[in-house]
A protein has these predicted regions:
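Non-catalytic DNA-recognition/assembly elements of restriction-modification systems
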Residues: 1-60, 65-77, 171, 175-221
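DNA target-recognition domains and sequence-specific DNA-contacting regions of bacterial/archaeal
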Residues: 39, 43-173, 224-225
Length: 225
């Protein structure tokens, strides 16, 4: 069924992501290819040296403002798609990292969204791309394996500020090493994006067909997917 295929795609993507995380951990955290020692052309630095923040382009829209908009492009909040709107602020592949509200999981790792295409973001998520050899995909893996509980402020409304995020210590591999790693993980993330796009199409198809199937307007036996 359509629902089973969507679930299968999600399971495959989870497995692909775990594979990519294992590759990152082996190479850049455990340093297994380098006998556990950081190569001399790598350096210790901070997140500010490897990310570009696009937070200044964010524009929050109230639920009232969104109510009459045609539902075309995803409208992201700190943790997920909150709504759909008829315009977009960004177009491309970006990493969203929760800024306030729910910003870490129960183990202290940041709430991340790997997004692509045309979309809008409210002011509750940091919008990130990479620099100095770091791609969005490599940043996703880095942050998914970095506990950030210590930089969260605010008891009532948890927050990860730009300043605290930028000051997180990181290992910065050489650009050659980053390029080599990127060539390995890009096909994995390409497959993740393709499966996610397929699931989105299947979800749209299901949402269109289901009411017509339930009403008897169309016969399930005549459907070809």
């Amino acid at each position: 069924s359509i629902s089973e295929k969507i679930r299968c795609n999600a399971k495959v993507n989870d497995n692909l992501l775990r594979q990519a995380q294992a590759l990152y951990k082996n190479r850049f955290i455990d340093l297994k290819p380098f006998n556990g020692k950081m190569p001399p052309d790598w350096q210790l630095g901070t997140v500010s040296e490897i990310i570009e923040l696009h937070d200044s382009k964010r524009i929050p829209l109230s639920s009232r403002e969104r109510a009459n908009l045609t539902k075309i492009y995803p409208y992201y909040g700190a943790t997920s798609v909150m709504d759909y709107v008829d315009r977009y602020l960004f177009d491309g592949i970006y990493l969203l990292l929760g800024e306030d509200g729910t910003v870490v999981d129960d183990k202290g790792f940041p709430i991340l969204q790997y997004v692509e295409g045309k979309f809008w973001v409210n002011n509750h998520a940091h919008i990130i791309t990479g620099k100095n050899g770091f791609t969005v995909e490599t940043l996703y893996l880095l942050f998914s394996l970095t506990n950030v509980r210590s930089i969260v402020t605010g008891a009532v409304q948890p927050k990860i500020s730009q300043a605290n995020l930028n000051n997180v210590s990181v290992v910065i591999p050489s650009k050659v090493e980053l390029s080599t790693f990127n060539s390995i993980v890009q096909p994995i993330f390409s497959q993740i994006r393709n499966l996610r796009a397929e699931s989105d199409r299947l979800t749209s198809t299901r949402d269109i067909l289901l009411p017509r199937l339930m009403s008897g307007e169309i016969d399930a036996a005549n459907i070809q997917l």
